[in-house]
């Protein structure tokens, strides 16, 4: 367990997260308006989104399905009866004067997610609920020195708010949870998880306490927009609370904002309670009733999820858990790997994938979907190494050409004359030449200077243009030099 080191001893982190995940949907939660990112301001606003009098919301069925699938991925209970409520507050970018949410009867409850801890063990984080709600618009204060502007393109976009219990005990665990949740949402297809674009936002509820003591007063940090900032915000806020408590002051329950530039949190407003929002059922929307048939249908059509893939890779492909997790961390990489793994040695493929290919992709700043090397050609390269057609050293040269051109490895090997020399007679002839040309080195090796062996290997490689089979060269050289 991680601790905050105070002047008077150690303090524990107590952290709960609220994740706002924008639902992957072409239209909004209660209107047919488009959800395309970065459209011209107020170009995707219906009368419903603008809260014009008499306009009634109509629930988007696709958004409901996305929430159910996410709940199933979280091993949660899907409530067959849920209700939409009005959360009442006034803000300029909320034209209705209330937000449609689910307070009393959410669509999903009681889920779990396992995350790795610093000790290598798995820790279960309980999911209190997942509920549907609509997003607000966007206030813009930097367009004019005299006016503020409102963009309602985002108003009414469907969100899933995923709320954990306060089971998280360190900033790193919080980051692991968000990373794993984001990956799950991407596999399911219910959210793209792009935190930079704001389609996934994190609020952190943070308190501190001495070991064994009751929970302390919590503060909520709003709209943290990156994994790195989650760690920074929690570390700063927890230390701030410890400093206050150790100096005899009390923690005020409040909502705070994190400034990524300064690495500090600041007061935004005093924390509201549920009573402040005067929740009541929305009279314009009927309760949502979900059938067993729909739940079973959506469950049957779920894709293979990250934890299932990790288990499959460790069992079927004999990968280490670490390697499996690295591959599964990106759905596109996992898809690429599976296409190639059926045609070659999966372990060797993994080594080349995570070292050579990842390195080149990072250098080129592109994703695996933009890579010119097809999974089939990558598998062919691995097979050429497996069957000793080329050496690992030559394979790197071939790989670089493949990455630049997309050519098949066998054609590159043929065109460049890179086939590995594995003929014993040819290699013995070359070795005899090397031994004849270096009598003093031979005498030195036979008198106990074992390090000279590398010299002989290098000379053979030089004469064959680096194409000699290194395993055979070692074997034949030892036989020749010891005779």
Curated annotation (Swiss-Prot):
* Xref: InterPro entries: Asn/Gln-tRNA_amidoTrfase_suB/E, Asn/Gln-tRNA_Trfase_suB/E_cat, Asn/Gln_amidotransferase, Asn/Gln_tRNA_amidoTrase-B-like, GatB, GatB_C_1, GatB_Yqey_C_2, Gln-tRNA_amidoTrfase_suB_CS
Mention one GO biological process in which this protein takes part, according to its record: translation
Q: Please state which protein family the record places this protein in.
A: Belongs to the GatB/GatE family. GatB subfamily.
For this entry, the protein name equals Aspartyl/glutamyl-tRNA(Asn/Gln) amidotransferase subunit B
Subunit composition and interactions: Heterotrimer of A, B and C subunits.
Gene3D superfamilies in the cross-refs: 1.10.10.410, GatB domain, N-terminal subdomain (1.10.150.380)
> What keywords is this UniProt entry annotated with?
ATP-binding, Ligase, Nucleotide-binding, Protein biosynthesis
Q: Which organism is it from?
A: Rickettsia conorii (strain ATCC VR-613 / Malish 7)
């Amino acid at each position: 367990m991680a601790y905050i080191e105070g002047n008077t001893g150690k303090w524990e982190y107590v952290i709960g997260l609220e994740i706002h995940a924008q639902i992957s949907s072409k239209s909004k939660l209660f209107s047919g308006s488009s959800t395309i990112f970065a459209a011209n301001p107020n170009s995707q606003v219906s009368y419903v989104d603008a809260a014009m009098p008499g306009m009634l919301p109509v629930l988007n069925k696709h958004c409901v399905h996305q929430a159910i699938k996410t709940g199933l991925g979280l091993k949660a209970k899907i409530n067959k009866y849920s209700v939409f409520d009005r959360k009442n507050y006034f803000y300029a970018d909320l034209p209705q004067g209330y937000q449609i949410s689910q307070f009393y009867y959410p669509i999903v409850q009681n889920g779990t997610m396992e995350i790795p801890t610093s000790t290598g063990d798995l820790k279960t984080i309980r999911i209190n609920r997942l509920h549907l709600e609509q997003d607000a618009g966007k206030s813009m204060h930097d367009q004019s020195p005299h006016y503020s502007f409102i963009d309602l393109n985002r108003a009414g976009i469907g969100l899933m708010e995923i709320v954990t219990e306060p089971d998280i005990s360190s900033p790193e665990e919080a980051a692991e949870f968000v990373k794993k949740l984001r990956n799950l949402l991407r596999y399911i297809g219910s959210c793209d998880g792009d935190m930079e674009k704001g389609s996934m936002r994190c609020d952190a509820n943070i308190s501190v306490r001495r070991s064994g003591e009751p929970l302390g007063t919590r503060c909520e940090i709003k709209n943290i927009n990156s994994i790195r900032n989650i760690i920074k915000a929690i570390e700063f806020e927890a230390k701030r609370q410890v400093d206050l408590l150790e100096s005899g002051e009390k923690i005020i329950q409040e909502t705070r904002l994190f400034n990524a530039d300064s690495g500090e949190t600041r007061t935004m407003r005093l924390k509201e309670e549920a009573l402040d929002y005067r929740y009541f059922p929305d009279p314009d929307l009927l309760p949502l009733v979900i059938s067993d048939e729909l739940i079973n249908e959506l469950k049957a059509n779920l894709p293979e999820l990250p934890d299932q893939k990790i288990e499959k890779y460790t069992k079927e492909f004999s990968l280490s858990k670490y390697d499996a997790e690295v591959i599964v961390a990106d759905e596109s990489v996992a898809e690429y790997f599976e296409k190639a793994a059926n045609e070659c040695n999966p372990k060797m493929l993994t080594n080349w994938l995570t070292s050579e290919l990842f390195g080149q992709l990072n250098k080129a700043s592109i994703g695996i979907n933009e890579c010119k090397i097809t999974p089939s050609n990558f598998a062919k390269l691995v097979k050429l190494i497996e069957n000793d057609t080329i050496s690992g050293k030559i394979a790197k040269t071939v790989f670089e050409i493949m990455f630049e051109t997309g050519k098949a490895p066998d054609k590159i090997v043929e065109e460049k004359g890179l086939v590995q020399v594995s003929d014993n007679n040819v290699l013995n002839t070359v070795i005899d030449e090397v031994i004849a040309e270096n009598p003093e080195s031979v005498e030195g090796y036979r008198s106990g200077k074992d390090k000279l062996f590398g010299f002989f290997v290098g000379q053979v490689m030089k004469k064959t243009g680096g194409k000699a089979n290194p395993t055979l060269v070692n074997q034949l050289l030892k036989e020749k030099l010891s005779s």
